[in-house]
């Protein structure tokens, strides 16, 4: 693991060095390598594809502007980039919580789009999407600290150490938040009658 991490750190440092020198291909490689992960994280916090896309773009603008601050001695590129992403996404989430907007029309349009999607089993796809939406609604009800840890561990599949590095909190705190978040999510889903209890 140490050798793999060292290799990842060296590769990330080299990509950043090339970007700083004006190599567009290096920047494109960074974006292609990490954009899906950033988008997934943004989507888990926003539950909206358009907002997640906007946040993903914002993250990469910030990353590009912050390349001079990247120091491979403090961790690999992925951890640094995902820490920037997490901070920006959490900040956006907090702003939206303070100033909620009426998004019913947008949600209705999304629903119409999903109903038009074709497939062999429309019913099964609708059930899968509904279950996914219900689970996401349950995740949205968790406190920010619990939600962040649950998303990073159970959805983004980061290791405990990666979460520790990303959030800069002790491993015991990470494990506690994940456990409490899972328990709370199960209670929420039972109340929503998503799972039997």
Where are these regions (language model features)?
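Acidic, proline/glycine-rich intrinsically disordered inter-domain spacer in sigma factors
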Residues: 2-3, 10, 110-137
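N-terminal module of bacterial RNA polymerase sigma factors
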Residues: 1-37, 123, 140, 187, ...
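Σ70-family region 2.3-2.4 aromatic/basic alpha-helix that recognizes the −10 promoter
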Residues: 35, 43, 57-64, 74-95
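Helix-turn-helix DNA-binding module
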Residues: 133-173
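Short, basic/polar amphipathic helix motif occurring as a linker/hinge flanking DNA-binding modules
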Residues: 92-114, 126, 196-197
């Amino acid at each position: 693991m140490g050798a793999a991490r060292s290799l990842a750190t060296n590769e990330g440092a080299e990509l950043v060095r090339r970007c700083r020198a004006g190599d567009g291909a290096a920047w494109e490689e960074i974006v292609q390598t990490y954009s899906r992960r950033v988008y997934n994280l943004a989507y888990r916090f926003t539950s909206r594809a358009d907002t997640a896309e906007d946040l993903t773009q914002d993250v990469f603008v910030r990353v590009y502007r912050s390349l001079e601050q990247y120091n491979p001695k403090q961790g690999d590129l992925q951890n640094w980039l995902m820490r920037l992403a997490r901070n920006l996404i959490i900040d956006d989430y907090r702003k939206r919580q303070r100033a909620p907007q009426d998004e019913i029309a947008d949600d209705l349009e999304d629903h119409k789009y999903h109903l038009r999607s074709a497939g062999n089993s429309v019913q099964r796809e609708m059930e899968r999407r509904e279950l996914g939406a219900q689970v996401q609604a349950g995740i949205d009800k968790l406190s920010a600290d619990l939600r962040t840890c649950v998303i990073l561990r159970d959805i983004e599949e980061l290791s405990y150490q990666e979460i520790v590095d990303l959030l800069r909190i002790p491993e015991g705190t990470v494990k506690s938040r994940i456990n409490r978040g899972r328990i709370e999510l199960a209670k929420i889903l039972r109340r929503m009658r998503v799972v039997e209890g």
